[in-house]
Amino acid sequence: MSHPFRTAVEARDLDAMRATLTEDVVFFSPVAFQPFRGRDAVVEVLGNVLEVFTNFTYTDELAGDGTQALVFRATVDGKQVEGLDHLMLDEHGKVTRLTVMLRPLSGVIAMAEQMGPRVAHIAKGTG
């Protein structure tokens, strides 16, 4: 059974995504040195990610006790990327920590170039 976070991302539904996160969720991005903290900041960043990624699709998922890994493919500025959303869950199944890994380096650089201007104001307030 898929985690509601996956369902929300696939539907591009920010309200549903917000409902899957704890108030104090921490998001570790592959293109930011400091994590984003708090549900409002994380939802704003993820909304921007959804605008930058095209052809986004989850291709696999792995689940364990209190954790979920969602493997994905997408395109960023014409570059194919592969990545993984690693979710750490609380006792209610809500996301307490989200770590995103991305490859190859050319895709990470493209992502950083696209996301930097969009989220700089968020990063200053959450690190």
Regions found by a protein language model. Give the residues of each.
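C-terminal and inter-domain tail/linker signature
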Residues: 1-127
